[in-house]
């Protein structure tokens, strides 16, 4: 009979703990990771710019659908393999060195930009991805911190390296 009070109490404390942890995390964050590739910036930029092909090499994106342009900017709905749906809009496009896109969770409290910067180095290039994000929901902030704010960037850099048959060494 005591367990009927202990188990719900423990669950309530865990939920309260996540809420408090999320509330003390900053809503905004900036994260940058980079990777050296043995590819020309033009080759890497072309792959990143071709969003229709994203599901063929990304371990997280299942489907990409084009949406009507937003203020003259290309927009897509990207369905992740785990079910989340993001709206991505191209904000800046400077081939072959810079690509900036915004991402927002459809109907949700997550918003941010990803900036791809490609710098020639030797026979290849260094690609740096910077995420400037904002999560208003404290539970999202808590889970993002526990998961690692750089996890999505590292996954995309790993996918890029594998697409080109290279071993990822992310910095």
Model region roles, listed by residue range:
Residues 71-75:
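Short coil-to-beta transition motif at edge beta-strands of beta-rich domains
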């Amino acid at each position: 009979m005591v367990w009927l009070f202990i188990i719900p109490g423990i669950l309530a404390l865990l939920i309260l703990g996540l809420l408090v942890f999320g509330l003390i995390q900053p809503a905004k964050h900036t994260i940058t990771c980079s990777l050296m590739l043995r590819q020309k910036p033009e080759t890497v930029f072309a792959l990143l710019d071709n969003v229709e092909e994203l599901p063929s090499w990304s371990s997280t994106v299942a489907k990409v659908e084009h949406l009507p342009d937003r203020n003259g900017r290309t927009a897509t709905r990207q369905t992740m393999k785990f079910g989340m749906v993001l709206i991505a809009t191209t904000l800046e496009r400077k081939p072959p060195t810079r690509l900036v896109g915004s991402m927002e969770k459809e109907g949700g409290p997550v918003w941010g930009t990803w900036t791809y910067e490609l710098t020639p180095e030797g026979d290849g290039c260094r690609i740096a991805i910077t995420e400037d994000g904002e999560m208003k929901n404290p539970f999202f902030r808590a889970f993002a911190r526990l998961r690692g704010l750089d996890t999505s960037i590292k996954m995309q850099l790993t996918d890029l390296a594998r697409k080109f048959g290279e071993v990822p060494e992310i910095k």
